[in-house]
Structure formats: structure tokens, C-alpha cells
């Protein structure tokens, strides 16, 4: 069978080549993203594999339908950048990789948390300014003395809970669809109580429409003074302007943001112009109690291997069996 892959990163290429060798399938890969123009390269292929944070527009699915291509598999989890209505209209079926490496993202959230609890941004800022003495004045907090509120107890949230619990933290959690059975490492609470009780709030919820700005001014008002918020989940979860206001007022002690609210716009400008101007990003970047990263929490060798191999196997399942266990019919985490 013939498969075409889009958004290929340098680190993925070795796995694309190895997969093609292992399976004997024809695999053509491109670094460009899948859009209304590049989709034309897929004519004559059996299925499409892709990875991107930029939108999958309706025109992509229209042309897939015209070419007789019925299946798209993505190498990530989230589908909030996919026009699901158009996808269904043109009869395209979709699969994602719901759990390529939960540990990668959970460990990253823990890393940001420890960095902020020990005021390392402030320490580094003073060292870079040449003030060694002042750099030693920022007293930290121990994770084992904190209450950590984990929002979302799916694959990633469960690993995060174990990590935080391993440091001795008290862990509480919120999920509209709670796990059944015993869960000795944490207690479920309401979302309001999670905001009120947590010293650290760690987000692992999907980017579906009803979760847009789930962390907003009202949520910040409920939080403890000196709370820390970590988002390695999806870009739309936090009202960034409200977050900035609470950082400036001192209500928030710090934030760790790997999935920035306006990352899609910035990436589109970066691709088009070679750079982007985002005053809000620049302001956050200059704050020592803010840890920003470019959507890399998932980015480990294990995760990249699994993203490639799992997603391509899902495409093979679609093409040979007409189904796959990870088919997505609605918004996915």
C-alpha cells in the first residue's frame, strides 16, 4: 500500500524509514504541513498520515474525497485543529494516537512545577545580572508540602498523579468523567474546590470547546494567593490576558506554559514570514516566574517513535480491516 506523510520532522525520518523497511509498504514523507495545496501530492496514495498544530481546513477533506482517499491518521492526540464537520461531510475517517507516551508530558509538568517552586527563574535572572548575593535570597517550597490539583485523570493525568504523589504531595483531582473503583493516590473534588484548595494546578484536559478558558478570571479569583498553574495540555484552556493580570498583581506565584493560547497564529506567521510578532508572548517571556516552552512536553525519543509507528499501524488497520481501535468520531484530547 502507498502512504504519504506530512509535517515530517527531522527526528521522525529515521522511524519513517525503518517502518517502511519493516513492513514493505511504500511511504513518502514531506516536511510541509497538510493544507489545501499540499494535499494534491496525495493523489494516487491510499492514505494520509500527518502531524501539525495548524488547521486542517475543509478544502483538505474535499480533495481527499475527490482523490478517493478515505483515511487520515494523525501522529498526535488533539483534534481541535481539525474541521470535524467537513471531515464527516466528505466521508473521511480519522484516527489519532491517544497515548504515545503519557510519561513524557507528565514529567514535563513536574519539571515546570519544581522549577517554579524553587524560584529558579528569579535565581537565574539575578545570576545573569551579576548579582550572586541576591540570587541566593529566593527561598523555595518543597513539593511534598503542597496540595496539587490535577485537572483530568486520563492517561497523562494518571501518570502525573503518581509522580506528584511520589514526591509526597497531597493530590486532589477533577474530571467530569471520574475513574471508577479505588484510587488511593488522590481524591476527586469539584472544580471549584480544586481551585480553592490547590497550591499547584496541573492541566491535563482536552481542548474541546466547552473547556475554552476553563481557567479564566473567575477561576483565578477562587485560587489561593501564590498558586502555580501548569498547562502542558491544550492552548485554549487558559485566558492568557487574565493570567497575565494575576501574575502582575502577585496573585499567581508562577505559571508553566507549554501550550500557549496563540501558538497557532504565531506558527502560521512563522511559516509565512520567518518570524512572528506577539507582544503578549514577549511580555510573558520576560517574566522570571513564567516558564514558556514551544509545545515540546511530548518531545522524547520514546514518544516520537511511538507517534510514528502507532499512527502508521492505525492507517494500515483502516486500509486492511476497515477499522482501528483509535478511530476518532468527535473532539479528542
From Swiss-Prot:
UniProt keyword annotations, A-Z: NAD, Oxidoreductase
Temperature and thermostability: Optimum temperature is 50 degrees Celsius.
Extra remark beyond the main annotation: Can be applied in an industrial process for the production of D-2-hydroxycarboxylic acids.
Residues annotated for 4-methyl-2-oxopentanoate binding in this entry: 100, 295
EC number: 1.1.1.345
Function field: Catalyzes the NADH-dependent reversible reduction of various 2-ketocarboxylic acids to the corresponding D-2-hydroxycarboxylic acids. In vitro can use various substrates, including 4-methyl-2-oxopentanoate (2-oxoisocaproate), 2-oxopentanoate, 2-oxohexanoate and phenylpyruvate.
Classification via Pfam families: 2-Hacid_dh, 2-Hacid_dh_C
Residues that hold NAD(+) according to the record: 155-156, 175, 205, 211, 232, 234, 258
Annotated family: Belongs to the D-isomer specific 2-hydroxyacid dehydrogenase family.
Highest rank taxon of the organism: Bacteria
Active site feature: 234, 263, 295
Subunit architecture: Homodimer.
Notes on activation and inhibition: Completely inhibited In the presence of 0.1 mM Hg(2+). No influence on the activity could be detected with Mg(2+) and Ca(2+) and only very weak effects with Cd(2+), Co(2+) and Mn(2+). Reducing agents and thiol group reagents do not affect catalytic activity.
Descriptive protein name: D-2-hydroxyacid dehydrogenase (NAD+)
GO molecular function terms listed in the Swiss-Prot or TrEMBL record: D-lactate dehydrogenase activity; NAD binding; phenyllactate dehydrogenase (NAD+) activity
Coiled coil regions in record: none
pH dependence: Optimum pH is 5.5-7.0 for the reduction of 4-methyl-2-oxopentanoate. Optimum pH is 8.0-9.0 for the oxidation of (R)-2-hydroxy-4-methylpentanoate.
Catalytic reaction annotation: a (2R)-2-hydroxycarboxylate + NAD(+) = a 2-oxocarboxylate + NADH + H(+); (2R)-hydroxy-4-methylpentanoate + NAD(+) = 4-methyl-2-oxopentanoate + NADH + H(+); (R)-3-phenyllactate + NAD(+) = 3-phenylpyruvate + NADH + H(+)
Amino acid at each position: 500500500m502507498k502512504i504519504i506523510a506530512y509535517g515530517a520532522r527531522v527526528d521522525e525520518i529515521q522511524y519513517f524509514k525503518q517502518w517502511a523497511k519493516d513492513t514493505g509498504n511504500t511511504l513518502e514523507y514531506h516536511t510541509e504541513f497538510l493544507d489545501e495545496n499540499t494535499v494534491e501530492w496525495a493523489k494516487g496514495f491510499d492514505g494520509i498520515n500527518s502531524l501539525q498544530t495548524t488547521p486542517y481546513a475543509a478544502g483538505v477533506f474535499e480533495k481527499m474525497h475527490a482523490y478517493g482517499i478515505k483515511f487520515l491518521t494523525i501522529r498526535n492526540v488533539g483534534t481541535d485543529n481539525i474541521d470535524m464537520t467537513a471531515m464527516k461531510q466528505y466521508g473521511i475517517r480519522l484516527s489519532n494516537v491517544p497515548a504515545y507516551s503519557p510519561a513524557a508530558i507528565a514529567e514535563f509538568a513536574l519539571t515546570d512545577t519544581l522549577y517554579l517552586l524553587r524560584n529558579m527563574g528569579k535565581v537565574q535572572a539575578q545570576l545573569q545580572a551579576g548579582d550572586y548575593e541576591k540570587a541566593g535570597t529566593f527561598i523555595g517550597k518543597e513539593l511534598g508540602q503542597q496540595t496539587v490539583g490535577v485537572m483530568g485523570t486520563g492517561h497523562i493525568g494518571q501518570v502525573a498523579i503518581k509522580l506528584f504523589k511520589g514526591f509526597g504531595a497531597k493530590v486532589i483531582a477533577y474530571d467530569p468523567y471520574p475513574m471508577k473503583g479505588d484510587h488511593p493516590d488522590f481524591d476527586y473534588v469539584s472544580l471549584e474546590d480544586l481551585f480553592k484548595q490547590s497550591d499547584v494546578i496541573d492541566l491535563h484536559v482536552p481542548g474541546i470547546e466547552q473547556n475554552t478558558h476553563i481557567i479564566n478570571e473567575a477561576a483565578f479569583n477562587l485560587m489561593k494567593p501564590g498558586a502555580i498553574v501548569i498547562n502542558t495540555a491544550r492552548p485554549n484552556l487558559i485566558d492568557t490576558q487574565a493570567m497575565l493580570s494575576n501574575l502582575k498583581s502577585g496573585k499567581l506565584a508562577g505559571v508553566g506554559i507549554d501550550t500557549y493560547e496563540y501558538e497557532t497564529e504565531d506558527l502560521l506567521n512563522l511559516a509565512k514570514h520567518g518570524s512572528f510578532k506577539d507582544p503578549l508572548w514577549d511580555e510573558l517571556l520576560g517574566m522570571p516566574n513564567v516558564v514558556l516552552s514551544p509545545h515540546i512536553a511530548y518531545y522524547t525519543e520514546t514518544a516520537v517513535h511511538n507517534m510514528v509507528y502507532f499512527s502508521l499501524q492505525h492507517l494500515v488497520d483502516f486500509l486492511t480491516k476497515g477499522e482501528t481501535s483509535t478511530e476518532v468520531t468527535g473532539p479528542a484530547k
